[in-house]
Amino acid sequence: MQSGTVDGLYHEVHGGPASDRQTVILSAGLGGSGTFWAPQMQALMSRFRVVLYDHRGTGRSARTLTDPHTVAAMGDDIVKLMDALGLERAHVVGHAAGGNAGLALALNHPDRLDKLVVVNGWSRPDPHIKRCFDTRLALLNDTGIAAYVHAQPLFLYPADWLSANNARLEAEEVHHINGFPSPDVMRTRIQALLEFDIDEDLETIRCPVLVSASADDMLVPLSCSRRLAERLPNATLDIAPWGGHGFTVTAPEAFNAAVLNFLSGEAA
């Protein structure tokens, strides 16, 4: 594994030279940390060179944001990372905010993208998503970082999985609090997501897209993924029956298989 920081973006490269294998770039959700993808690494590394990174303002990356900070800027950061690594093209797998960044990349830099996987993403503001983000912001603003972090599993995971894995979640909570971005960074990232709207441009995105969603996601309605799949010209919709917003964590085996099949050209 090689790691480094370019233009403020911490990243890791897992696998051999780009000449030996195709490269997959993993882009996390609102939290921004590349460690989110731990349940996917072994499966993806069996066939691909894997690059993960921490979003700007989060994790081990620079804690300052671009101004203005938009989802398009998040997509531009992927291009900056590719440029630094000498990658002309790559596959991108993105969860929620990271999936939206992938859509922005596909729209603004189509020549840099091979295939895109959008996990629990959306193309326009949604009332349910806004209500969830408003609630998270109220927790952050009114009660602080610890309360915000403590509440996150309620948005991410099914209730039965949360109950069964509570000890694990409590152990992770201290780490998440210690590594939390500044409240201003989190507010700005949420605002960028609430303003993201490329709905009228979806038909211009021509690359193959796997739209991956969980039927019981309580943060992003399934209708958002259905809309993406209906309006993107070259999209495939894959719906997990269970797993919540973070089904990449709660049900990784089926997700990993679907992504590998899609990226390898084996999807039906």
Swiss-Prot record:
Its EC number is 3.5.1.-. It catalyses: carbamate + 2 H(+) = NH4(+) + CO2. Residues 24-243 form the AB hydrolase-1 domain. InterPro entries: AB_hydrolase_1, AB_hydrolase_fold, AB_hydrolase_sf, Pyrimidine_utilisation_RutD. One of its GO terms (molecular function) is hydrolase activity, acting on carbon-nitrogen (but not peptide) bonds, in linear amides. GO terms for biological process: acylglycerol catabolic process; nitrogen utilization; uracil catabolic process. Keywords: Hydrolase. GO terms for cellular component: membrane. It holds the Pfam family Abhydrolase_1. It comes from the Bacteria. It is an enzyme of class 3 (hydrolase). Belongs to the AB hydrolase superfamily. Hydrolase RutD family. Involved in pyrimidine catabolism. May facilitate the hydrolysis of carbamate, a reaction that can also occur spontaneously. This is Putative carbamate hydrolase RutD. It comes from Caulobacter sp. (strain K31). The lineage of its organism: Bacteria, Pseudomonadati, Pseudomonadota, Alphaproteobacteria, Caulobacterales. The gene is rutD.
